[in-house]
Amino acid sequence: MSVIKMTDLDLAGKRLFIRADLNVPVKDGKVTSDARIRATIPTLKLALEKGAKVMVTSHLGRPTEGEFKPEDSLQPVVDYLKDAGFNVRLAQNYLDGVEVNEGEIVVLENVRINKGEKKNDPELGKKYAALCDVFVMDAFGTAHRAQASTYGVAEYAPVACAGPLLAAELDALGKALKEPQRPMLAIVGGSKVSTKLTVLDSLSKIADQLIVGGGIANTFIAAEGHNVGKSLYEEDLIPEAKRLAAATNIPVPVDVRVGTEFSENAPATEKSVTEVQADESIFDIGDKSAEELAKIIKSAKTILWNGPVGVFEFPNFRKGTEVISNAIAEATANGAFSIAGGGDTLAAIDLFGIKDKISYISTGGGAFLEFVEGKVLPAVEILEKRANG
């Protein structure tokens, strides 16, 4: 990956425009999950240590361009950074210039409020670029989108580089996908085969073993001819599931946990996969299946994990994902390289307290999947172009 890295630049006195991913959940004006902010803090500290004048921005939620609403503001992120000890303030009208003092961080208000952001309007890209001496792309989570704050600004800024977080993401994903230690295992969960089909296809060519979970696994169970009751599955994709199962080693659950309603306190019944009734839905894998998968996980040398194997948010349907999480942590402790990505996966990692037991946790959802699919990420492509003149 030939991009300029922020870590290699002399930044003393330079105006830095950092595009971070601070798109965090907010409730009643407070940040409710701080993983993305925590991941960005080392970049901010490094920029300050190097003597830069630091501006940082991000999108938050899905605001209407050109319309400011208080709930779309990055103010809760500013409050969080203040509490973390930073000298920080919010700038709302910054497109015609903003004063930045040494030692402070200026958070530029939600980029998605700016007209032309999503369409990558060149005029907006030029305005962002005019604010800085160096543009730092550090938002892997939006690297798959060519927008004014991820692509346009990189075209026009005097220098465009990759921040530490983006560089680490690309290195870790490269390690897992380009030269994996064997055997390589990929775990893909989620509700639909259709949304992960290209990912499953790509991984079936790289991985020695695939594990599918969640609604995806239900389609594979149905492909084996079993009744899945009211479970979420995709009948039209059964032929695809059969094709993938024939091409790659994909174990299908032998036992499952079912419920008759989708609710937090729904009672769970464990049974053989052959015994699912018409009024039941599969919400988790059973103990035997979890044990089998844990064995497979513990023998892997590279593990790529995207998605849970059950509705782990509900206590009665949590066990399968918990067993798998702990098996990944154990394999990692024994020398495997593990990389995890995707919102649900990160929530599971938090819930089961294994954050420090995974080799690398990706902050990207869609970008993580597109990289796995082998797609070019526009925001990375422009950094490569700029690095190579």
From Swiss-Prot:
Subcellular location(s) of the protein: Cytoplasm
InterPro entries recorded: Phosphoglycerate_kinase, Phosphoglycerate_kinase_N, Phosphoglycerate_kinase_sf
Catalytic reactions of this protein: (2R)-3-phosphoglycerate + ATP = (2R)-3-phospho-glyceroyl phosphate + ADP
PANTHER family referenced in this protein's UniProt entry, alphabetically: PHOSPHOGLYCERATE KINASE, PHOSPHOGLYCERATE KINASE 1, CHLOROPLASTIC-RELATED
Pathway given in the UniProt record: Carbohydrate degradation; glycolysis; pyruvate from D-glyceraldehyde 3-phosphate: step 2/5
GO molecular function terms attached to this record: ADP binding; ATP binding; phosphoglycerate kinase activity
EC number: 2.7.2.3
Enzyme class: transferase
Main localization, broad class: cytoplasm
Tagged with keyword Endoplasmic reticulum: no
This protein's record includes keyword Amino-acid biosynthesis: no
Similarity annotation: Belongs to the phosphoglycerate kinase family.
Gene (name only): pgk
Residues bound to substrate: D21, L22, N23, R36, H59, L60, G61, R62, R112, R145
Residue sites binding ATP per the record: K196, E313, G342, G343, D344, T345
Protein's recorded name: Phosphoglycerate kinase
